[in-house]
Curated annotation (Swiss-Prot):
Pfam families, alphabetized: SMC_N
Family the UniProt entry places it in: Belongs to the RecF family.
InterPro entries per the UniProt record, alphabetical: AAA+_ATPase, DNA-binding_RecF, DNA-binding_RecF_CS, P-loop_NTPase, RecF/RecN/SMC_N, RecF_2
Coarse class of the protein's main subcellular location: cytoplasm
Protein name from the UniProt record: DNA replication and repair protein RecF
PANTHER family: DNA REPLICATION AND REPAIR PROTEIN RECF
Any GO CC annotation of this UniProt entry: cytoplasm
Record key words, sorted: ATP-binding, Cytoplasm, DNA damage, DNA repair, DNA replication, DNA-binding, Nucleotide-binding, SOS response
Gene3D superfamilies per record: P-loop containing nucleotide triphosphate hydrolases, RecF/RecN/SMC, N-terminal domain
Superkingdom, taxonomy of origin: Bacteria
GO annotation terms (biological process): DNA replication; DNA synthesis involved in DNA repair; double-strand break repair; SOS response
Keyword presence, Nucleotide-binding: yes
MF GO annotations: ATP binding; ATP hydrolysis activity; single-stranded DNA binding
Length: 374
């Protein structure tokens, strides 16, 4: 069983609808119940900001601060992490550039948010993701990259460096500055980073596919088959150096085409995650809404198991409205599966009775008007 990473305390100041709030946890799962709009998802969002990035809502930091607050917002968390007990603080202050946030780990200023992955890994599932299979390919890429990031913390830096290099190339092409040596240098950097990104995605999907196959008979959810499409399809068994050379040549040959288009038309930023319902042999986008939700839940929980298996530390799960629209039997099976992962899960719902099958495996809190009651 993987080591259980768990929060023991969460404290918020001027975060969303919370002027001040504290949550004391005993290591069990945490169930947050209350009316819609009470602030349950806001608590989940605060926990999600203990990982790199902008959290489960991807909100601008300035928008997170409570309306009417004199300063910025702050989040404090104490947890039993991957390297032992740790305290994490993050937030912004009044007048700060709100594209970045401050981060302190055990009282020391962190150099980058990537340091958070030394202490915990987070996965989440929200109602906003229900349209993942029918929505824009950019949403699926973002979802895929978060899955990769939980196994390969360097992936986020590679992706941001690739985007930065691509913007530089696009700017040069837009300005008509076709300096061969300058562009070649940028394109070589894009090739190195882009192929590394694509290989990391392929490796993660291969590992996840094998785990789904191994647990197919025991999972209460349908099995997903996964593949990438849209960038050098079928080529990733070749040596990476050959792939880098080919992609760099592709970029060089497409300069005038990309200049006309106003963007780079080939690369990992154009790839798409293709998901099929294995039992039905059907593309996920053609499945019913309920089947899509079941596929997505099964996929996220399978990935959580993979993270625990490979890192030795179970991820913390944030499952917003996870029990909605499930019958009693499937809810019980879901809770058993979550509990069997060996980690701590935060779950929300409007009805406390929906979580009765958890029994004493969870602390249950009521959220109302920016207040939390156990």
């Amino acid at each position: 069983m993987p080591h259980k990473v768990s929060l023991s305390r969460l404290k918020l100041t001027d975060f969303r609808n919370y002027a001040a709030a504290a949550l004391d946890l005993d290591g069990r799962h945490a169930v947050l119940t209350g009316d819609n709009g009470a602030g349950k998802t806001n608590l989940m969002e605060a926990v999600s900001l203990l990982s790199p990035g902008r959290g489960l809502r991807r909100a601008a930091y300035g928008d997170i601060t409570r309306v009417g607050a004199a300063g910025g917002f702050s989040i404090f968390a104490a947890l039993d992490g991957m390297e032992g007990e740790v305290e994490i603080g993050t937030g912004i202050e009044t007048g700060e550039e709100t594209t970045a946030r401050r981060l302190r780990i055990n009282g020391t200023q962190a150099k980058t948010a990537d340091e958070l992955t030394d202490h915990l890994r987070l996965l989440w599932l929200t109602p906003a993701m229900d349209g993942l299979f029918t929505g824009a390919s950019s949403d699926r890429r973002r979802f895929l990259d978060r899955l990769v990031l939980s196994l390969d913390p360097a992936h986020g830096r590679r992706a941001s460096d690739f985007e930065r290099a691509m913007r530089s190339r696009n700017k040069l092409l837009d300005e008509g500055r076709f300096d061969p040596s300058w562009l070649a240098g940028i394109e070589e950097q894009m090739a190195s980073l882009g192929i590394a990104m694509a290989l990391a995605r392929q490796e993660m999907l291969g590992l996840l596919t094998r785990l789904i196959e191994e647990t197919r008979e025991t999972s209460p959810f349908p099995s997903a088959s996964l593949q990438l499409s849209g960038f050098m399809d079928g080529q990733f068994t070749r040596p990476s150096v050959d792939l880098e050379d080919e992609y760099a040549a592709m970029l060089s040959e497409s300069r005038y085409r990309d200049a006309g288009a106003g963007r780079t038309l080939d690369g990992p930023h154009r790839a798409d995650l293709i998901v099929h319902h294995r039992e039905k042999a059907m593309e996920a986008e053609r499945c019913s809404t309920g089947e899509q939700k079941a596929l997505l839940v099964g996929l996220v929980l399978a990935h959580a198991r993979l993270v625990g298996n490979l890192t030795g530390h179970a991820p913390i799960l944030l499952l917003d409205e996870i029990a909605a629209h499930l019958d009693e039997g499937r809810r019980a099976a879901l809770f058993d599966l979550i509990d069997g992962l060996g980690g701590q899960a935060f779950m929300t719902g409007t009805d406390r009775a929906m979580f009765s099958a958890l029994g004493d495996r969870a602390q249950v809190f009521t959220v109302a008007d920016g207040k939390i009651f156990e």
